[in-house]
Structures are given as structure tokens and as C-alpha cells.
């Protein structure tokens, strides 16, 4: 496909593995990202590593080689897609208690989790009438795409998933449960939760939705809609190309071109999801940010990340030059 000729490689990765020295790993990893001009965010915790980054083919290969040099990460799970533009603005490595937040300390996928199902075998599993298929992602992600017949838990964040399980699932009644998420990390931790609660047959999609879209032909696919991603692309289609959604700056919800025509939508300030939830103070702040973004765009800069720093430095230099010119004029 043509997208493979694009310049930017977007790489989503994770691995549940005990990293007792995760704090010491942070700076060398960040230095490697910066050296190779890899942008995005990686999370480190005692339970493993997780994140999405982007860069040129060479820079991503260099980062993966660096990670795989650690025997604990030699088989790190990663999925790649492609984009014409850099979808991230900064290079960040954060230290966390969990690499994906469930909020239950005793749940450890390194000790127990469900059975991996390869993308090529996923259709057979979820077509089984005995299988309970659950989308472990958030409400706003599910709204724009999911698998046929998947259950929506209606959660706003992953921390709410344990409550959904307690209130809606029963190991005696639901004998066969299959779960999925964007890249595989949330559903892997979800299977650990269900196994801990006594569920027997628990399955999860290896590599998540992104791997399924990559490996399963569109004509055989049971995926419906687009897949939400946590970067400036907002969503990708079945070809892993940027989809038809943008994102509201105020609430981060995905929005369509039709949504932008609604009266509640004001670029950079509000949309129909949040117009009645955003305070006037917030709207004023968002309006100022949008103004600065427009000014930055006119100068050929982005308003965030490294380019914002360049713009700030440029403005500072201009002010200093103006002050110096005024001082010299006053001395004449």
C-alpha cells in the first residue's frame, strides 16, 4: 500500500515485564529518543513499558534496537502504522505506578492472564455464539468503531472496568469471554482481572485492533468503523491511514465534519460534546490558545512542542531588538 512509502512511522508498543530498575531506565531512554528525533510518550513502571512514538524508519529502528538490547524487552510487542506528518510534538518518558491504570495493585499480567488469539483466528472466536465479546476501551473510542456484536461497557476510563465486571459478568454464567482494545495492553490486563475473579476461558486479541487491521483483509474483516488512536491522527481506517475524524481541543472527543457544522462547535473552544460543560474562564483560555496557534501557523510554527520554543525565542529576540533600537534612538 502507498502508506508504507510515507516518511513517518508511528510505533505503538508495550510489554508486561518486571522492571525493578524502571526509574534508572528513564533518562537513558529519553536521551535515545531525543538523539534519534523520536517523539511521543513512553511510560515506565515496575510492571513494564507502554507507549506510542513516531519518527523516520531509521530512528524507530534505532529505538527498537536500543530497547531490545535489554534481554527483558527483546520480544517487546509493537505495531506500526504510517502518517505523512509527525503526530507528536515532544519526546517524553514518564514514570508511573502502572503502565495502564486499572487501579488494583494485586492484578499482575506477568503472573496470570488470558489466552492470546492471533488476528487470523479472531473471527472464528467471536463468531461463536458462546463467546461474550467485550470492548475494553472508553466510550468515546467505541463510538467511532468496534467489532460486530461487541459489548460496550460504557466506561469513561479504564479504572471503571472492574466495576463493570463486578456488576455485569459472572464466571458461572459467562464461560467464554473475549476482549480487545487498541494495541492489546488494556485487554491483556483485563484478562488478568477476570482470571483473578475466577473466569476460566478468557481470551484477548494479540496485538489489538491495530494488528487485526494490519493482518486481516478488509473483505474478511468483522471490524466496523474506524479505530481511535491517541495522537493527532485521532483515528485510522482499515488501511491504517488517517481516518475521517478530528478532535475537539476542549474535551478531546472525536468529531466529524458534520459535527463542525453544529452551532455548538467553535474551533479550539467547544463542540456538541462539551459546550455546556466548559466554563467561561476555560473558553477564554481556549480562545487565547487558538489565537496563538493561528499566529504561530502564520509564521510557519506549531504552537506546541519544540517549534513553540523556537517561536518563543524568535519573539523574545524581536522584543530585545526593539528595546535596543528604542534605547539607541533615545541616546541620539
UniProtKB/Swiss-Prot annotation:
Residues 308-332 are annotated as: Disordered. GO terms for molecular function: oxidoreductase activity, acting on paired donors, with incorporation or reduction of molecular oxygen. Residues 127-221 form the Rhodanese domain. Keywords: Oxidoreductase, tRNA processing. Residues 321-332 have a biased composition (Basic and acidic residues). The keyword Acyltransferase does not apply. One of its GO terms (biological process) is tRNA modification. It catalyses: uridine(34) in tRNA + AH2 + O2 = 5-hydroxyuridine(34) in tRNA + A + H2O. CDD domains: RHOD_YceA (cd01518). Signal peptide: none annotated. Its EC number is 1.14.-.-. Catalyzes oxygen-dependent 5-hydroxyuridine (ho5U) modification at position 34 in tRNAs. PANTHER family: RHODANESE-LIKE DOMAIN-CONTAINING PROTEIN 7-RELATED, THIOSULFATE SULFURTRANSFERASE/RHODANESE-LIKE DOMAIN-CONTAINING PROTEIN 2. Belongs to the TrhO family. This is tRNA uridine(34) hydroxylase. It comes from Francisella tularensis subsp. tularensis (strain SCHU S4 / Schu 4).
Amino acid at each position: 500500500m502507498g502508506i508504507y512509502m510515507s516518511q513517518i512511522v508511528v510505533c505503538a508498543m508495550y510489554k508486561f515485564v518486571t522492571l525493578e530498575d524502571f526509574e534508572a531506565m528513564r533518562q537513558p531512554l529519553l536521551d535515545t529518543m531525543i538523539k534519534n528525533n523520536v517523539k511521543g510518550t513512553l511510560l515506565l513502571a515496575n510492571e513494564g513499558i507502554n507507549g506510542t512514538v513516531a519518527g523516520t524508519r531509521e530512528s524507530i529502528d534505532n529505538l527498537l534496537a536500543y530497547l531490545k538490547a535489554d534481554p527483558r524487552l527483546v520480544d517487546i510487542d509493537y505495531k506500526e502504522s504510517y502518517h505523512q506528518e509527525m503526530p507528536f510534538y515532544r519526546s517524553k518518558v514518564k514514570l508511573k505506578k502502572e503502565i495502564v491504570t486499572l487501579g488494583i495493585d494485586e492484578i499482575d499480567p506477568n503472573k496470570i492472564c488470558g489466552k492470546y488469539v492471533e488476528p487470523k483466528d479472531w473471527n472464528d472466536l467471536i463468531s461463536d455464539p458462546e463467546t461474550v465479546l467485550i470492548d475494553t476501551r472508553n466510550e468515546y473510542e467505541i463510538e467511532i468503531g468496534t467489532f460486530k456484536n461487541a459489548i460496550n461497557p460504557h466506561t469513561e476510563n479504564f479504572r471503571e472496568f472492574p466495576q463493570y465486571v463486578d456488576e455485569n459478568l459472572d464466571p458461572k454464567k459467562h464461560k467464554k469471554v473475549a476482549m480487545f482494545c487498541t494495541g492489546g495492553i488494556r485487554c491483556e490486563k483485563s484478562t488478568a482481572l477476570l482470571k483473578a475473579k475466577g473466569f476460566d476461558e478468557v481470551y484477548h486479541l494479540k496485538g489489538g485492533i491495530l494488528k487485526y487491521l494490519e493482518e486481516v483483509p478488509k473483505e474478511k474483516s468483522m471490524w466496523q468503523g474506524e479505530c481511535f488512536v491517541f495522537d493527532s491522527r485521532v483515528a485510522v481506517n482499515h488501511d491504517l491511514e488517517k481516518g475521517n475524524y478530528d478532535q475537539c481541543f476542549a474535551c478531546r472527543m472525536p468529531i466529524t465534519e458534520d459535527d463542525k457544522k453544529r452551532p455548538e462547535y467553535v474551533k479550539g473552544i467547544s463542540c456538541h460534546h462539551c459546550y455546556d460543560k466548559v466554563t467561561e474562564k476555560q473558553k477564554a483560555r481556549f480562545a487565547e490558545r487558538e489565537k496563538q496557534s493561528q499566529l504561530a501557523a502564520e509564521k510557519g510554527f506549531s504552537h506546541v512542542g519544540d517549534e513553540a520554543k523556537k517561536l518563543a525565542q524568535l519573539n523574545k529576540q524581536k522584543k530585545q531588538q526593539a528595546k535596543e533600537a528604542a534605547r539607541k534612538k533615545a541616546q541620539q
